[in-house]
From Swiss-Prot:
Keywords: Hydrolase, Metal-binding, Metalloprotease, Mitochondrion, Protease, Transit peptide, Zinc
UniProt KW Mitochondrion keyword: yes
Superkingdom of the source species: Eukaryota
Disruption phenotype: RNAi-mediated knockdown causes 54 percent embryonic lethality. Embryonic lethality is further increased in simultaneous RNAi-mediated knockdown of mmpa-1 and mmpb-1 or ucr-1 and mppb-1.
Name listed for the protein in its UniProt record: Mitochondrial-processing peptidase subunit beta
Regulation: Binding to mppa-1 is required for catalytic activity. Inhibited by metal chelator ethylenediaminetetraacetic acid (EDTA).
Site feature: Required for the specific determination of the substrate cleavage site: 163, 167
Native species: Caenorhabditis elegans
Gene name tied to this protein: mppb-1
Record's function text: Catalytic subunit of the essential mitochondrial processing protease (MPP), which cleaves the mitochondrial sequence off newly imported precursors proteins. Preferentially, cleaves after an arginine at position P2.
A GO CC term assigned to this protein in UniProt: mitochondrion
Xref: SUPFAM superfamilies: LuxS/MPP-like metallohydrolase
Length: 458
C-alpha cells in the first residue's frame, strides 16, 4: 500500500477504559528518559544479539515552505555522503566492517535514520548516526550528484500512479498548507537547492526537543542513555512548533487525465482525524471492516470483508484498499482503487453502501470480529527489532509516550457498536467527499453526484 500512509491510535477517556479489563499480553516494558536538553531516549529490550537503533525527527515536508520544499528528502540523500570525520568510502567501509545496515526515510511529518547492528556495535552505530545527522559535509559535488539521483527518482514516482494519486490528492485537499507539498518537492526547487538550504534546515529542525533516539532488541536502557548523552547531549533544544501551520481539509475533485490508461487509478476520501483524536481507534476498526482486495494477491492477511467479497466478483476491479491516514491535526480516511471505467459505478456504490452500513446497521458480531483482527494485525506488525524500534519512535513523536499493549487492547475492546456507528455517521455520512483520479477521468462522477447517491442510500 501507499508507502506514506499511516495508521494511528487515539486517547479515550479513562471512564471507557475502566469498563474493560486488559487481557494479559506479555511485552517488554518501554523505558523512556529525557535528557536535560529535551532529547528523548526510549528503549525496549526484546533480547537477542542484534538491535535496531534510530533517530526519529519531528521534521518532514510539512515543515518546508514554497522556497525549500524537498529539502528534508534531499538531506536524507546527503546523509550518507560523508562528514569531516568520515569520507563517503570510509563510512561505507566502517558500516560494512561492523556488520551494520543503515537506512533512512522521509514522510510528510517526520524523518528517520536508523541502524541495524550487533548489540556490541551499538555505541559505534550511534556515533555514526549522530555524525551523519549533525556533521554532514554537504559537499557541492555530492549535492550535484544527488540532484540527478533525485530527479530520476521523481521520474520513477511519476510512473507510479498510486504515488501520483496521493500526491495530487494532498495538493488539493490541503491546498495553501505545507501538508499539501510532495515529499520530493517540485523539480524547479530540486534543481536549485544548495548547501545553505540544507544546512539551514538542519539548524532549524534537527533540534534535541524534536528528536527521539529509539532502540529495540538486545539493548540496555542505561547504556543507550549514556550514548545519547555522549553524542546528542550538547544539541540545542529548539522550538517544537517551528513552522508548523495547522492544515484545513478542503473538499476537492482533482483529475489527472491520461486517456491511454486502460484503468482508472484513484482515491475517494472524507476527512479523518488526528493521531490523538478520541475517534481514531474507532476509525481503525471501521477501516478493518472496509477491508482490502488485490486481484493479484487476494484478500490480504485477514478474512475477506463483505465489501471485499462483493468487489472481488467484479472482474473490472483490480485493487481496492481502505486506509486511515493520520496527521497532527487532521487526517484522511477512504479507499484507494484501481478499476476499469465500466466498473467505477459499482465501486463507488459499493463503498458508499458500506459507509451507510457502518453508520446504521453494523452489528456486534461484525464489530467483535474486526476488533480481534485489529488486535492481531497490530501485534503482527511488531515482529522484529526494526518494526518495534520504528513503532517506539513514531509513538513518542505522535503521543509523547509509548502506549502499552494491554492499554491499547483495553481501548480497542472498549469500543461499542453504538460508538462505532456514531463515529462512522459523523465521518462518512456527514463528511464531505473528495476524490483524486488518474486515467480516463471522464468516467468518474462529480462530487455532487457522489454525495447525492450517498443521501439516497440513507
Amino acid at each position: 500500500m501507499y508507502r506514506r500512509l499511516a495508521s494511528g491510535l487515539y486517547q479515550t477517556s479513562q471512564r471507557r477504559i475502566a469498563q474493560v479489563q486488559p487481557k494479559s499480553v506479555f511485552v517488554p516494558e518501554t523505558i523512556v528518559t529525557t535528557l536535560p536538553n529535551g532529547f528523548r531516549v526510549a528503549t525496549e529490550n526484546t533480547g537477542g544479539s542484534t538491535a535496531t537503533i534510530g533517530v526519529f525527527i519531528d521534521a518532514g515536508s510539512r515543515y518546508e515552505n514554497e522556497k525549500n520544499n524537498g529539502t528534508a528528502h534531499f538531506l536524507e540523500h546527503m546523509a550518507f555522503k560523508g562528514t569531516p570525520r568520515r569520507t563517503r568510502m570510509g563510512l561505507e567501509l566502517e558500516v560494512e566492517n561492523i556488520g551494520a545496515h543503515l537506512n533512512a526515510y522521509t514522510s510528510r511529518e517526520s524523518t528517520t535514520y536508523y541502524a541495524k547492528c550487533f548489540t556490541e556495535k551499538l555505541d559505534q552505530s550511534v556515533d555514526i548516526l549522530s555524525d551523519i545527522l549533525l556533521n554532514s559535509s554537504l559537499a557541492t559535488k555530492d549535492i550535484e550528484a544527488e540532484r540527478g539521483v533525485i530527479i530520476r527518482e521523481m521520474e520513477e514516482v511519476a510512473q507510479n500512479f498510486q504515488e501520483v494519486v496521493f500526491d495530487i490528492l494532498h495538493a488539493d485537499v490541503f491546498k495553501g498548507n505545507p501538508l499539501s507539498y510532495t515529499i520530493l518537492g517540485p523539480i524547479e526547487l530540486i534543481q536549485t537547492i544548495n548547501k545553505n538550504d540544507l544546512q539551514g534546515y538542519i539548524n532549524t529542525h534537527y533540534r534535541s526537543g524534536r528528536m527521539v533516539l529509539a532502540a529495540a532488541g538486545g539493548v540496555n536502557h542505561d547504556a543507550i542513555v549514556k550514548m545519547a548523552e555522549k553524542y546528542f547531549g550538547e544539541l540545542k533544544h529548539g522550538d517544537s512548533s517551528t513552522e508548523f501551520v495547522p492544515a484545513t481539509y478542503s473538499p476537492c475533485e482533482v483529475r489527472g487525465d491520461i486517456p491511454d490508461l486502460p484503468m482508472l487509478y484513484g482515491a475517494m476520501v472524507v476527512e479523518g482525524v488526528s493521531w490523538t483524536h478520541e475517534d481514531n481507534l474507532a476509525l481503525m476498526v471501521a477501516n478493518t471492516l472496509m477491508g482490502e482486495y488485490d486481484r493479484m494477491r487476494g484478500f490480504g492477511v485477514n478474512a475477506p470483508t463483505r465489501l471485499a467479497e462483493k468487489l472481488s466478483q467484479d472482474a473490472g476491479i483490480e485493487v481496492f484498499q481502505s486506509f486511515n491516514t493520520c496527521y497532527k491535526e487532521t487526517g484522511l480516511v477512504g479507499t484507494y482503487f484501481v478499476a476499469a471505467p465500466e466498473s467505477i459505478d459499482n465501486l463507488i456504490d459499493s463503498v458508499l453502501q458500506q459507509w451507510v452500513w457502518l453508520a446504521n446497521n453494523i452489528d456486534e458480531a461484525a464489530v467483535d470480529r474486526a476488533k480481534r483482527s485489529l488486535h492481531t494485525n497490530l501485534l503482527l506488525m511488531l515482529d522484529g527489532s526494526t518494526p518495534v524500534c520504528e513503532d517506539i519512535g513514531r509513538q513518542l513523536l505522535c503521543y509523547g509516550r509509548r502506549i502499552p499493549t494491554p492499554e491499547l487492547h483495553a481501548r480497542i475492546e472498549s469500543i461499542t457498536v453504538q460508538q462505532l456507528r456514531d463515529v462512522c455517521r459523523r465521518v462518512f455520512l456527514e463528511g464531505q467527499v473528495s476524490a483524486a483520479v488518474v486515467g480516463k477521468t471522464q468516467y468518474w462522477p462529480v462530487n455532487e453526484e457522489i454525495h447525492g447517491r450517498l443521501i439516497r442510500m440513507q
